[in-house]
Amino acid sequence: MIEDSIRRDVKVVEGPVVMGIDIARRGGDSSAICVRQNNHIIGNGIMTKKGFDLMQVVGWIRDEIENVKKSGIEVSEVLIDSIGLGAGVVDRLLEEGIDVRGVNVGESSSVSTEFWNLRAELWWKCREWFAKKDVLIPRDERLVEELASVRRLWPSNGKLQVEPKDQTRQRLGRNTSPDAADALILTFASYASMTTGKRSWKEPLERKTLGIV
């Protein structure tokens, strides 16, 4: 389902352009930016930077927002993971007059009866996006690997849960989080995505899988 989205010949659908930004939390992690418009990811893949301090990340984000605008594309929402260092990044960008919104994926889901937290809901929205089979993503090996590696858990309380990042790190065989995939799922926290209808995760899947996507 994921790799098919690289080769698929689809009509690009216009709509709001959303930027999702995952902020590195530990030394081995990268900060990542994903720009998505409706059914496709814009550009050559997920942009990543490693080893940046808070102010360097702020400058990088500011530059990338301007680069997108210079290409004639207006970004409607900039969504930043606000856990840990991300909170400082959000505060600084807001101080500079840049319109961004912090997203805490650890908080409660908007559908609390179905999802363990917002992170689980966003991953499920990402899965629904791919399941439509009309999406297009760049050839980004890191993104594909990360999307395929994250597993869902089978909770006793009936709420969908996504495995802890440490488990994903072990599966990936590298001391890094699924930063590229996290940047993509943040785009589904946009106001447009959060107000569209959703299919319950409890409905039968087309194929049996341990993964989310």
Q: Which residues make up each language-model segment?
A:
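Residue-level detector of short, conserved catalytic/binding motifs and their immediate flanks
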Residues: 16, 31, 76, 181
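Mg2+-dependent endonuclease catalytic cores in nucleic-acid-processing enzymes, primarily RNase H-like
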Residues: 35-159, 205-213
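Short glycine-/acidic-enriched loop or helix-start segments at secondary-structure transitions
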Residues: 30, 89-91, 195
